[in-house]
């Protein structure tokens, strides 16, 4: 069962995907979670902190599993197939997060934005390495 913190992040991702990060108030988010808006601050420092955690985590998970899939595959072709399957499965299973990452990442505080971009570059590098091994 997901922790309360995970439940809040899931609800926030859904609402941010529907209305945008700036289109959701803390009061609305709290109500959707079944708590008061101010009660959210027991779990997160701010709404920005929620966005940062969800987007840093999604980027880190993509990188971690992408590296794992590409390095445990038996060949470059198998690595590419594993990466494609992983990325598509992840995107389909986490549609709200993908929308938020695409649309709202610029709303992140600078430090989190840099962390997300750095992690995304590393994830792209995983793909580049596999593709270059197939087509040098």
Stretches with model-predicted labels:
Residues 13-16, 62-63, 80, 84, ...:
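Short, structured motif recognition centered on aromatic/hydrophobic residues
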């Amino acid at each position: 069962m997901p922790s309360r913190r995970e439940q809040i992040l899931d609800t926030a991702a859904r609402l941010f995907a529907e209305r945008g990060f700036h289109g959701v108030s803390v009061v609305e988010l709290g109500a959707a979670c079944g708590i008061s808006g101010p009660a959210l601050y027991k779990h997160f420092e701010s709404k920005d902190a929620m966005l940062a955690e969800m987007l840093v985590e999604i980027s880190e998970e993509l990188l971690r599993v992408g590296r794992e899939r590409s390095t445990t595959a038996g060949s470059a072709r198998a690595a590419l197939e594993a990466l494609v399957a992983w990325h598509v499965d992840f995107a389909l299973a986490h549609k709200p997060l993908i929308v938020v990452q695409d649309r709202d990442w610029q709303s992140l505080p600078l430090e989190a934005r840099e962390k997300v971009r750095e992690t995304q570059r590393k994830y792209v590098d995983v793909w580049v390495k596999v593709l270059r091994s197939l087509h040098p």
